Swiss-Prot record:
Coarse class of the protein's main subcellular location: nucleus
GO biological process, any: cell projection assembly
Domain of life where this protein originates: Eukaryota
PANTHER family noted in UniProt: GLUTAMINE-RICH PROTEIN 2 (PTHR46766:SF1)
Gene that encodes the chain: Qrich2
Organism: Mus musculus
Disulfide-bond pairs as recorded: none
Region (Disordered): 488-592
Subcellular location per the Swiss-Prot or TrEMBL entry: Nucleus membrane; Nucleus; Cytoplasm; Cell projection, Cilium, Flagellum
Protein's recorded name: Glutamine-rich protein 2
Biased composition (Polar residues): 544-567
Oligomer status and interactors: Interacts with AKAP3, ODF2 and TSSK4. Interacts with AKAP4.
Length: 592
């Protein structure tokens, strides 16, 4: 009720405030009208009779409005007084009601506190009663358990007296033996008797065997009557032998034989596992064939890497033995690395030129270059009539022979025109075994074989000027691949702690002096793909080939090289610009 009254008074005061603003605006308007009606704007002389001034105001209307506004103001003042009185009378009533409420609240709080105290007392009394009940219940249970135990364990008086009368004497009990002890002693005696019987039977068997042996030996002995004739016979034989030795003394001669026989396979046992072995007898091997000096070595069709790794292994072995090798200084190594970087940058520029050459203003991709070469190869007239024309990939001049003028280059080899082999010929000659250092640091056994290069068929296409320009670009790509191989070798040597870096780097930069080595990239151009697959490759060669195939060469250049390799064309290059050194005869020695 009180809240509703206070809310109503607040609402009335709000409405009065709004009304006050309206009245103030009306007062301003009425005062304006009054001022306008009082002040004349124009003289009446200027007006035409019967004409109304539009800007003039009605004084009567202005007065009526002002009167009504004054009434509203008076009414507002009365309402304001009523609201103010109502608001003033509320605090006194509110204070009186608040005092009564506080007194009642005090009585209620005191009653609540008293009830809380009584509840706490009741809780304490109840808990005490519950605890006493539990204790009494436990005592009752203990009593019941005691009664049950007494019922089970208590003895009858008559039974107790009878048992006391029949109890055993202490002296008689001491003379008795326990049954467990008696059983254990009996078992032990039985075991001992069985052992004695077994020993006696064994001794009897041994005695019988010994007796049989003695009887057999006695039967095999000579009788005393038989000893005298035997003695007489031996003496007669001895005398006859001595007489023969005296009459014919032995002739001692030196050992001579037309031929001798020696055991080649001897019987041995392994020191670790004691396994029987049949191995050859070590010793000097007698050669049955005359020793002839070998022919001069030729350059190998295998890459330089096999020789370089073998040279690194030999250098490390010689260093372990104590021999001294010249070391490459850091300046030479830096110059070599700088030259390597310059060649690599030049090769990248050439690669870009190749792409622009095939693609025009836009760099050609690998697929574009492959399709372009394929269409050029198919549209070439040599391809259309390749079966009818002769092979002009080699020079038609007959090969010179004899003297130092027979020194030829791989790309200037002459082939007899009257021969037309239909298949590839491979002749293998076995040589000594060699050690090959693998990338994992282990040394593997390899065998040196000699293989002649394959002879191309007559279906190889000819060489054109356009293809010559492409071959020059391919040679530059081959140089890039060679540089990448050198970088891979350098990384592999850095990974092996026992390899010496400076000598190996010097060997990689400078061409090796060993004639039995060649470059993998150049030989892959001169040998057909079928023959190259048939050749055995060492573990180093396989790893290097896999590294070259997975290296960071752009795919378009690699496809260009593969498509151009399928043409199997040869071009005359000056010795200074070639990729290989001149060789004497066919380059055929390979390590695998």
């Amino acid at each position: 009720m009180e809240n509703s009254v206070s809310e109503a008074s607040l609402y009335l005061q709000d409405q009065l405030d709004k009304l006050r603003t309206i009245i103030e605006s009306m007062l301003g308007s009425s005062s304006t009208l009054l001022s306008m009606s009082i002040t004349p704007h124009k003289s009446t002389a200027c007006l035409v009779p019967g004409q109304i001034d539009p800007e003039a105001t009605c004084p009567a209307c202005s007065l009526d409005v002002s009167h009504q506004v004054s009434l509203l103001v008076q009414r507002y003042e009365q309402l304001q007084d009523m609201v103010s009185g109502l608001a003033a009378s509320r605090p006194s009533k509110k204070a009186k009601l608040q005092g009564q409420d506080e007194e009642l609240l005090g009585h209620v709080q005191s009653a609540i506190l008293q009830v809380q105290g009584d509840c706490e007392k009741l809780n304490i009394t109840t808990s005490n009663l519950i605890e006493d009940h539990r204790q009494k219940q436990k005592d009752i249970e203990v009593l019941y358990q005691g009664i049950e135990r007494l019922d089970k364990e208590k003895a009858n008086r008559e039974h107790l007296e009878m048992e006391i009368d029949e109890k055993a004497d202490k002296s008689a009990l001491a003379s008795k033996v326990s049954r467990i002890q008696f059983d254990a002693t009996t078992e032990q005696l039985n075991h001992m008797m069985q052992e004695l019987v077994a020993k006696m039977s064994g001794q009897e068997q041994d005695w019988q065997k010994l007796l049989d042996k003695l009887l057999a030996e006695m039967d095999s002995k000579l009788d005393r009557l038989e000893l005298d004739p035997l003695k007489q016979m031996l003496e007669d034989r001895w005398k006859s032998l001595r007489q023969q030795l005296k009459e014919r003394p032995p002739l001692y001669q030196a050992d001579e034989a037309a031929a001798m026989r020696r055991q080649l396979l001897a019987h041995f046992h392994c020191l670790s596992c004691d396994r029987p072995l049949e191995t050859t007898v070590t010793g000097q091997v007698i050669s049955v064939t005359p020793i002839i000096s070998s022919m001069p070595g030729h350059r190998s069709v295998r890459p330089y890497t096999v020789f370089e790794l073998e040279q690194i292994r030999q250098q490390s072995r010689n260093l372990k033995l104590g021999s001294s090798f010249p070391r490459v200084d850091m300046s030479q190594m830096e110059r070599s690395v700088g030259r390597l970087h310059s060649m690599h940058s030049r090769m990248l520029m050439d690669m870009e030129k190749v792409q622009v050459h095939f693609g025009g203003s836009v760099k050609a991709s690998s697929q574009m270059i492959r399709e372009l070469l394929h269409t050029q190869c198919l549209s070439h007239p040599c391809y259309k009539r390749g079966a009818d024309t002769a092979d002009y990939s080699y020079s038609t001049v007959s090969r010179r022979c004899g003297g130092s003028h027979t020194l030829t280059y791989p790309y200037r080899r002459n082939r007899p025109q009257h021969l037309s082999p239909l298949e590839e010929i491979q002749i293998a000659m076995k040589h000594d075994e060699v050690d090959i250092l693998g990338l994992d640091g282990h040394i593997y056994k390899g065998r040196m074989d000699t293989r002649l290069p394959g002879i191309l068929g007559k279906d190889a296409p000819g060489v054109t000027k356009h293809n010559k320009a492409k071959l020059q670009q391919l040679q530059q790509l081959q140089q890039l691949q060679q540089l990448q191989q050198l970088q891979q070798l350098q990384q592999a040597q850095h990974a092996r702690p026992h390899a010496h870096r400076q000598p190996s780097l010097g060997n990689m930069i400078s061409p090796p002096s060993r004639p039995q080595s060649a470059q993998m990239i150049a030989d892959s151009k001169a040998v057909p793909s079928g023959q190259k697959k048939d050749r055995p490759v060492s573990s180093e060669g396989r790893l290097l080939q896999s590294n070259v195939s997975h290296s960071s060469i752009p795919t378009d250049i690699a496809s260009l090289q593969g498509s151009q390799q399928g043409l199997n064309m040869h071009i005359d290059v000056p010795p200074g610009e070639g990729l290989e050194e001149p060789t004497r005869g066919p380059r055929s020695t390979a390590a695998h």
